[in-house]
Amino acid sequence: MHSYDYWLILAFFAVVLLPAPFLGRFYYKVMEGQSTWLTPILGPVERGCYRIAGVNPQDEQSWQKYTLALLAFNLAGFLLLFAILLFQDHLPLNPQNLPGQEWTLAFNTAVSFMTNTNWQAYSGEASLSYLSQMVGLTVQNFVSAATGLAVLVALCRGIGRKSTKTLGNFWVDMTRATLYGLLPLCLLLALYLVWQGVPQTFAQYVNAVTMQGVDQVIPLGPAASQIAIKQLGTNGGGFFGVNSAHPFENPTAWSNLFEVASIILIPVALVFTFGHYVKDLRQSRAIIGCMLALFIIGGATSLWAEYQPNPALNNVTVEQAAPLEGKEARFGTTATVLWSVTTTAASNGSVNGMHDSLNPLSGMVALVNMMVGEVIFGGVGAGLYGMLLNVLIAVFLAGLMIGRTPEYLGKKLQAREVQLLVVTLLVMPVGVLVLGAIAASLPGPVAAVSNPGPHGFSQLLYAYTSASANNGSAFGGFGANTAFHNLMLGLGMLIGRFGYILPVLALAGSLAMKKTAPIGQNSFPTHGPLFVTLLTVTILLLGGLTFLPTLALGPIAEHLSMGF
């Protein structure tokens, strides 16, 4: 590693951690309807949205009504996007006259963007019109991120409130999350990316002739606006097929820094938002400490693995630097590793290099980041409500060990809460192991694998892990665009999204109705180093015990077979 690499890592943490506490407080004030510096500008727009939709912002909903509103909104978004993708050849803003998507691919894509997964079994510049990219995908990028934020806020209210049956109003939370929480930051990042060289145009693709006399088509489009939300909203779906490895999507070292940092900016800020909801920022610092510990462990392991020389070249008289296969030479090894760890620690899935070319242990780190449930920062809202589920599980385990009724911030965890927590523990195993096993047992789906042996198994395992974790990244050698995988991966995305959201909202409703007992000296503290350690071990054990056999068959076996 060179000095540039160390400065890159320091700059990354600075860009994320310095503004996060202030942004977290801003989100708390916004979601609770308090006045901010944006209120004079966006307040009239917000009130206009309520009048048009017939929503009274003072009316709050029970968790059941909140859930029904969320499901109805997401279903409508799915159907609209599905129709746009099917019939894009009959719609405007299609200068390349691209055909509509085949129905299983359209289903997969619509589910993918509705669930904030952004799994892409297609190449954007070769498959989608400008209208599909803007009105279809970009809109879903905003509302899927806002949905995650709304669910998190409902859970925060459930923990922070007492003796109430309401969690807020879904329509109000969605409006505020989009207007205040996402649009301003996305506007700033989009303008910055345009300055750095990312295209934002409705012009047709450019036909050029290379120096060798070969015709070449250079794709353009309204890319900057979509890239901004796909990073800040932890969506990850690229405007171009190779995502942020494309020079039009990520043209400079500065764009690379701000794009990778923006992946976890909002998830980190929302941890501080939670602290404001429960009126105890020590809880935020404990959760941030656990997230950082897991992130640094994974990052250090990945960096070490990627800087190891390839054993296949041991007997060749060449000087080996870090392997550069699948990496953008403009950015180098460290920038690629930092992105791969960040994009899988969050449920983002964007890439600036090819994960299929990572060394086995680096690929395993990416897998583990997703297998633990995308709780190491995670997606906008989704990451923190996933982490809070692990917090409650850790509190329950601590209560069992000391022989006391478990409680978190004065709320007792009883049978109903524990049952809901157990349901969430089944989401990743069902999505990854059950669906993945079905795919691995049939000859047709297995044909999508491009490599024999352990790496081929890792390709299939990565695909179903990514879908179930709502991440969206992939090992590029996996041929995902088949009817079977389009439908099965779409099912995995739905399980991974709503398998968490429904129990989380039920849990929020249950906790909101409870009284808050005063926290005394005999209460188990959830803000100190001991609890951070317990929480970290709980996350690793739950993920490790569940998925260790599959990891042994994939990346671990590949690592050993290569002779590292």
From Swiss-Prot:
It is a multi-pass membrane protein. It is found in: Cell inner membrane. Its main location: membrane. One of its GO terms (molecular function) is P-type potassium transmembrane transporter activity. The chain crosses the membrane at residues 4-24, 67-87, 135-155, 179-199, 258-278, 286-306, 382-402, 420-440, 487-507, 528-548. Keywords: Cell inner membrane, Cell membrane, Ion transport, Membrane, Potassium, Potassium transport, Transmembrane, Transmembrane helix, Transport. Part of the high-affinity ATP-driven potassium transport (or Kdp) system, which catalyzes the hydrolysis of ATP coupled with the electrogenic transport of potassium into the cytoplasm. This subunit binds the periplasmic potassium ions and delivers the ions to the membrane domain of KdpB through an intramembrane tunnel. The system is composed of three essential subunits: KdpA, KdpB and KdpC. Belongs to the KdpA family. This is Potassium-transporting ATPase potassium-binding subunit. It comes from Pseudomonas fluorescens (strain Pf0-1). The lineage of its organism: Bacteria, Pseudomonadati, Pseudomonadota, Gammaproteobacteria, Pseudomonadales.
